[in-house]
Amino acid sequence: MHRRQRKIKTDTVQPFLSIVIPAYNEERRLPGSLEKVLSFLQTRDYPAEVIVVDDGSTDNTVGIVEGFMARYPFVSIIKNDHRGKGYAVRTGMLAARGTYVLFSDADLATPIGEVDRLLAFLGDGYDIAIGSREGLGAQRINEPGYRHLMGRVFNLLVRLMAVGGFQDTQCGFKCFRREVAQDLFQRVQLYGAEAGLAKGGMVTGFDVEVLFLALKRGYKVKEVPVQWHYGANTKVSPFLDSARMFMDVLRVRLNDWRGKYKGTGDRG
């Protein structure tokens, strides 16, 4: 049974949903991903916005997004210097106007329709809903066994050193109430306002810091099993990026010991 397609609302009122997509040299994957996002939004009866944050791409990523902007007024782009995914996500989350704000990887490894599952929990009183590739109901499709094993080892380290209680902190599909996103992403230290320039594709452990701060701030976080597709053209380097993410976990713990997150528990 197919849903009747609707014209996507582009009112000047506050969007119900903001979709933030960080992009670095995504000229090949982004057109298909944006078409899928737009097709999904045509089946939903609420105003929305799509924000692509270009992370200093050297290909035609910006031109592709500008082509969509010419046809869809609710699609926009923010152009950053190349400072990495964490900084790009932060930029988009702070710029978003929606009641709820989702960030999603540019390849849509988690299908955009899975946002319905996250929104259900936000509507039920949670502050943050994070997509998870683990747990009952989660689906990991076409992922090599060694990649899964490395992910589980990293998650164990995250649990021991920074954020306990989550089976998957790294799925690039997380949704926040807007005021919560504003609070948390203004407080991040690793890839915040002072983030330096990056070299090449840069996958980081920024998610761990965001969740660490969320728990310190007393926010309610729900881990939601989702479908996730492994892409053969993934930009994640299993060794280099794993090492960088591990160092980020250490930096979160070190920042906490140094008192850089002091006072984050006082929400009033």
Q: In which residue ranges do the predicted regions lie?
A:
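Acidic donor-diphosphate engagement hotspot in glycosyltransferases and nucleotidyltransferases
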Residues: 33, 61, 89, 113-115, ...
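Donor nucleotide-sugar binding loop of glycosyltransferases
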Residues: 26-29, 57, 85, 111
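A conserved acidic beta->alpha catalytic loop
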Residues: 54-63, 108
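Acceptor/aglycone-binding surface of glycosyltransferases and processive sugar-polymer synthases
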Residues: 74, 80-95, 100, 112-200, ...
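N-proximal low-complexity "stem/linker" segments adjacent to membrane-targeting elements
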Residues: 1-39, 46
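Short beta-strand/loop segment that forms part of the nucleotide-sugar
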Residues: 46-56, 78-80
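Hydrophobic helical membrane-anchoring modules
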Residues: 1-16, 156, 187-268
